From Swiss-Prot:
Listed PANTHER family: CDP-ARCHAEOL SYNTHASE
Protein name per Swiss-Prot or TrEMBL: CDP-archaeol synthase
Cofactor: Mg(2+)
Gene Ontology BP terms: glycerophospholipid biosynthetic process
Amino acid sequence: MDLVGTVVVAVWAMLPAYVPNNAAVLAGGGRPIDGGRSLGGRRLLGDGKTWRGTAVGTAAGVALAVALNALRPAAADALGVVLPAFPPAAMGTLAFGAMVGDIAASFLKRRTGRQRGAAFPVVDQLDFVVVALALTALAVPAWVGDTFGLPVLVTVAVLTPALHLLTNGIAYALGVKDEPW
């Protein structure tokens, strides 16, 4: 597979994990997952991690995977690339894993004294990818092995931070986020 094909497959395969956190920001709010509880004088997660945001984010990622499966034949023909279909387990684990990764990073932020919205370089950009891929590898190891070869994984690791900063910058410019990272 050439470089363009590798990038296309990497982005396609990760879209169900890329979308959930954006959807959670747009539709979040409501009751915090941690219920306001603290550990060592610091909130466990903070007000930014809510049940509604997690549910909406996960649903958005799954819905996108369903849509991508429907579009896959036409997209593959148009792009000239073999695109992976998402098995149901991958749909759920990519989307939910992305949310869990972001929640875990929030927990780490609080434990290290960072406030909500504070920058946490590398962790902020890759937390959701690591957990989404790990959960998906547990659920559908053959699919992950077939889809995420080394070139695709490297592409995901390089592209994700740039995409993360770009989308957060756009959300900040639109007034949806309080900080651009």
